Design a protein with these regions (language model features):
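Amphipathic alpha-helical coiled-coil/heptad-repeat segments
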Residues: 1-142, 163-166
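Proline-poor, low-complexity alpha-helical tail modules
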Residues: 73, 148-171
Length: 171
């Protein structure tokens, strides 16, 4: 979010009309560096060996409605339990997070009007990234809840086993 917030700050500076062409070129240079970093993060972020936000052979839905993050054509299956039974796998949607898919390649700070238009693209990208973060957050909470339940179950089983052993010793 911080990079997107910085982009928004740059767009607002561009949209206010007080900057000359040299200043706007500097704003555009910083924007380009931020977009390169967003693309780098999107293409290199991994969980183990699983690429979270990109895959060369994935088909992406790039027909977004502004704020909707492009969904990759597959999910990340996360096994929840100790066995591979059906129902014990959590499928987490994958998203591509890149400047093109977030429509940040449409931003331009070269004049006031383009700067104003860029604010909208950046706000849409912020909303899209928030939705992706919420999706991963929900998956994390699901896994955390499952982990806590399994820990309680394990503790209860150990307590029951201990009680049975104590009973057998007393006999």
């Amino acid at each position: 979010h911080s990079m997107l917030q910085r982009l928004k700050t740059l767009a607002l500076k561009s949209a206010n009309g007080t900057y000359d062409q040299s200043d706007r070129e500097t704003l555009n240079m910083e924007k380009d560096h931020i977009l390169e970093e967003i693309d780098r993060i999107g293409s290199t972020t991994k969980f183990g060996e699983i690429s979270l936000f990109s895959r060369a052979d994935a088909n992406t839905n790039t027909n977004t409605q502004g704020w909707q993050p492009p969904v990759l054509d597959d999910t990340i299956p996360l096994q929840i339990g100790g066995s591979a039974q059906a129902g014990e796998v959590l499928d987490v949607e994958r998203y591509y997070i890149g400047s093109k898919e977030l429509q940040l390649d449409q931003t331009d700070f070269s004049d006031v009007k383009k700067g104003q238009e860029s604010v909208g693209y950046i706000e849409n990208a912020i909303e899209a990234v928030s939705k992706v973060r919420a999706s991963f957050g929900a998956a994390y909470m699901h896994l955390d809840h499952t982990h806590n339940n399994l820990s309680v179950t394990s503790e209860n089983m150990q307590a029951a086993e201990s009680q049975i052993r104590d009973t057998n010793m007393a006999e």
